[in-house]
């Protein structure tokens, strides 16, 4: 009985979560934070810095998710 109740609650929660996080068909969530884009400092972002990436032709290891190479392509050696 407890397992059934837990499953029902989990399904209801996941269903509600799907509807809450889904995009609005009228683009209602498109401008949820309109000022955040303009207040960002792109130079302060660590994602834009490529200081710790490997140059082309260097060993980058096993193919993996992420960007160890400056080009973003890693298949044992950087492209």
Swiss-Prot record:
Location within or outside the cell: Secreted
Q: In which tissues is it expressed?
A: Expressed by the venom duct.
Q: Which domain of life is it from?
A: Eukaryota
Say yes or no: keyword Metal-binding present: no
- The UniProt entry lists the main location of this chain as secreted
Which cellular component terms (GO) are annotated to the entry? extracellular region
Which residue ranges make up the pro-region?
A: 23-48
According to the UniProt entry, where is the signal peptide? 1-22
InterPro entries xref list = Conotoxin
Disulfide bonds listed in the record? 53-70, 60-74, 69-78
Does the keyword field hold Disulfide bond? yes
State any single GO MF term.
Answer: ion channel inhibitor activity
The domain-related comment in the record is: The presence of a 'disulfide through disulfide knot' structurally defines this protein as a knottin. The cysteine framework is VI/VII (C-C-CC-C-C).
Spell out the family assignment given in the record's similarity comment.
Belongs to the conotoxin O1 superfamily.
Query: What protein name is recorded for this chain?
Result: Conotoxin VnMKLT1-01121
Organism, as annotated: Conus ventricosus
